[in-house]
Amino acid sequence: MPQFTAIREESTFVDLQGVTIHRYRWRPGRPKAVVLIAHGLGEHALRYEHVAQRLVQAGYAVWAIDQRGHGATGVTQHGGDLERLGRLGPGGMRAVVGDLVHVLKQIRAEHPGLPVAVLGHSWGSLSTQILLNGYSDLVDAAILSGTAYRMPGSMNPGDLNARHAHLGDTGYEWISRDPAVVAAFAEDPLTFPAKVLPLFGVADGLRLYGVPRRIDPPIPMLIAGGSDDSMAGPKSLRRLGDAYRSRGGLTDVTVTVYPGARHEILNEINRAKVLDDIVAWLDARLLPA
């Protein structure tokens, strides 16, 4: 087991619809920038403890929340009924994005003058794309992990495990080549299948689709994923990068595809390399030369 050294602070806030959101923070002694992590569908923020620890080691403060219907937020929201995890509650996807905006404003207030990046994975990366369409002024850099170009034909709405089902019987073989990661996901009481329509309904499911709007001032963006990601894949990542250049007006867009990696590049067998790449990318763009 990895040895974690940074203390995790846990707190809550109540959002505009009255939902109690659980928030986590990890801080180095003197942070040089801040990263907000937005987790994916069917999981929770504490699956990113190792990511937070690596970023703190590199000098970054890290914030994360258990988003609507997920993790400790979902448990509180649904009165401890784990069968209801994934249901977003009042406000739906708009409230999900609103909660991220609220946290970004908190970060700006607590860390004035420091650069702020968002690291969104999977559903969290789609929420980040939606956020950037309206609140890019709160963000100095964006990392989209396990993401997709949010248009039909570029994002898989079906069974994400279909092409990996022959590799095991958990239903989660699609997330990583690391059997320990797959087993831990299957055994975690706070994880569940990422089935958008049954959980979100049609209206909020459709809100996941869209295209980039112009981002002014432009920010640097890293789009990263695995070549064997069944949610989208390399072609979708490149289309997304092209869209952020042409529609979003961004000039610093990096698209990185990790050969053989599945959906969760941050939990893949090459995760140390992925995290090193992310730290190097952040350092090059957020820190003074």
Which ranges hold each PLM region?
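Serine-hydrolase catalytic core
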Residues: 177-250
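Serine-hydrolase catalytic-loop signature spanning alpha/beta hydrolases and amidase-signature enzymes
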Residues: 40-50, 62
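N-terminal cap/lid segment of alpha/beta-hydrolase-fold proteins
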Residues: 1-27
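Catalytic active-site module of serine/aspartate enzymes centered on a nucleophile-bearing elbow/loop
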Residues: 247, 251-289
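Alpha/beta-hydrolase active-site loop
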Residues: 85-109
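Active-site glycine-rich loops that stabilize anionic/oxyanionic intermediates
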Residues: 32, 39-43, 122, 227
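Alpha/beta-hydrolase-fold enzymes
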Residues: 119-198
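Conserved alpha/beta-hydrolase
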Residues: 52-82
